[in-house]
């Protein structure tokens, strides 16, 4: 196995010590490209927190790109990047994810605020396979604070993603009462139907979330 392959495997397996060892013998590999874009993004996507720490400890902050800074939640680096005229805050990466979508999905509230302050489109639907906005991505990631920030910034709580799911469908299926309440408070439709005909109440019931079913009923959901 080459050092390149071994390093990618170590990142995916969250083997921080192995990442450090490979870096010692070949430090230039840390900025090698990967299918996800960079090793930092590979670590974030796979939830490899130990590997991510090893990578960030060995990566100069000014080497992080827009997508890495968004996904890892580095507001200081974001401010520097976005202060440069060449930065394009709404441009998706090769996988179709925007900086705001990455910060939202991975629960980086400070990064979300910086991106919004620099003109990120809160309702942009990038060409990713999930076809979701940043708010919907934050709901999928179960990040209540980020959803609140985006909703207060004008995020559409009734936008549709793949198979016509709304954010309320996802929150109801997750069983997150606070998220359901927040979405309803911002105008989410409790009777929206997705492909297959299910409403959020139907999805909550199928997942066994009785408290969510009761909550939705009190907020206008039909049986």
List PLM regions with ranges.
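Ankyrin repeat A-helix N-terminal signature
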Residues: 9-14, 42-48, 68-74, 102-108, ...
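N-terminal segments that cap or nucleate solenoid repeat domains
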Residues: 2-32, 73-92
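Ankyrin-repeat-protein effector appendages
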Residues: 1-9, 53-68, 153, 186, ...
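Ankyrin repeat domain, specifically the short helix-to-loop turn at the C-terminus of the second helix
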Residues: 23-28, 54-60, 82-88, 113-121, ...
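Ankyrin-repeat boundary/"N-cap" motif
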Residues: 2-7, 32-40, 62-68, 92-98, ...
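Ankyrin-repeat and related helical/solenoid repeat scaffolds used for protein-protein interactions
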Residues: 158-206
């Amino acid at each position: 196995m080459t050092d390149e392959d071994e390093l990618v495997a170590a990142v995916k397996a969250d083997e921080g010590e192995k990442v450090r060892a490979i870096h010692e013998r070949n430090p230039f590999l840390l900025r090698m490209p990967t299918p996800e874009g960079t090793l930092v993004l590979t670590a974030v996507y796979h939830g490899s927190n130990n590997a991510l720490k090893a990578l960030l400890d060995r990566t100069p902050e000014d080497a992080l790109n827009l997508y890495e800074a968004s996904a890892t939640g580095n507001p200081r680096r974001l401010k520097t990047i976005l202060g440069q005229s060449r930065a394009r805050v709404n441009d998706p990466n090769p996988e179709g994810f925007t900086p705001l979508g990455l910060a939202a999905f991975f629960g980086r509230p400070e990064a979300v605020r910086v991106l919004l302050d620099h003109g990120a489109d809160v309702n942009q639907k990038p060409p990713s396979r999930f076809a979701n906005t940043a708010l919907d991505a934050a709901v999928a990631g179960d990040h209540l604070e980020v959803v609140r920030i985006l909703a207060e910034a004008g995020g559409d709580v009734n936008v549709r993603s793949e198979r016509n799911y709304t954010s309320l469908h996802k929150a109801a299926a997750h069983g997150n009462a606070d998220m359901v309440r927040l979405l309803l408070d911002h105008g989410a439709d409790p009777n929206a139907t997705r492909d297959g005909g299910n409403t959020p109440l139907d999805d909550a019931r199928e997942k066994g979330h009785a408290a969510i079913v009761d909550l939705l009923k009190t907020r206008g959901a039909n049986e």
